Amino acid sequence: MAQWSFAIVADVHVFSSGQVPTSFSTVIARLAALAPRFVVVGGDATVGNPDDGVGADKVRGWWQSFQQALTPLRAAGIPVLAIAGNHDYYTAAHRSEYSAAWPTLDTDFTGVAPLLDGGSPPLSYSFDLDGVHVSLIHAVDQKLEPEVAAWLREDLAAAAGAGLRLVIGHVPLVSMIGHTSETFKNQLGSLLAQGQVAAYFSGHEHLVWEQELTFADGTVRQVHVGTASGTYHYPLNQSTCQAACQGDHGTIPLTGTRFALRPGTRLQADKVNICVVDIDGADFTVRHLCLREDQLVPFGE
């Protein structure tokens, strides 16, 4: 059986000045040494906001800085895929420069696998690799756009013969920091369950968490991958912390992973995190890694 890995890095947020957080540069150097088969940028590489008034030239500069930061991966022969996050996609300038930032995404990936027909990279698209079907979807807020839903439904139906189906989007099905849209959760979650998707990986919330969600047609594992720069992160919501935390420590119930909190807060102590997914045939294992003392080590205690 084929054994390989891929990684997801999300929520880097290049500074408005165009500077890349130094922590992310360190993450990329260490990640290149791990030699995953490919890396997915899980959205929010940039720092756009709805009314920022930033022009295309400045947004282009953000993307140039971000792409430069990925150089160690490409130098190691590790291709990079991407999806948009909300901060990459608010305004016309954000949207146009996001698409322009990934002109050769499909051709860069051909050495690993061809992207399947019918997708629209770098928004929603998919590929098959060694019996694993991976779908990347455009989900930048708690609203499933009809065209994304229609594409995903067809994409997963066509992948019914895959040994394993995984989906990556920016916004999680269930929020661990604030309000969950039940409509979004049920629309997307039901599609994933109907398509027998084993796991849905998301960014957006700048923390590490996992849970199993149940829908009428099955269960889906929800994986929050964290922020790969750690410039800021969010506290777990009060109800989650009451159920899973005691003092300055918490435990992810699904996995049993114990983690530290910043004293007196609901913030996870490990701020800079990435997700590595190990594939073994039709099975997969999720590894959350955090940056400590400039090294990638397992998240938690």
Residue ranges: model-predicted function:
Residues 1-60:
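N-terminal active-site segment of His-dependent metallophosphoesterases
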Residues 4, 37, 124, 131-132, ...:
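Alpha/beta-hydrolase fold active-site loops
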Residues 6-8, 39-41, 82, 167, ...:
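Residue-level marker for buried hydrophobic side chains located in beta-strands
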Residues 11, 43-44, 85-86, 170, ...:
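Active-site glycine-centered loops adjacent to acidic/histidine catalytic or metal-binding residues
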Residues 14, 47, 88, 173, ...:
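Short active-site segment of divalent metal-dependent hydrolases/proteases
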Residues 46, 159-177:
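Short acidic, glycine-rich surface-loop motifs adjacent to enzyme active sites
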Residues 51-161, 187-199, 207-280:
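Extended active-site neighborhood of metal-dependent phosphoesterases/phosphodiesterases
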Residues 288-297:
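Short, solvent-exposed aromatic-acidic interface loops
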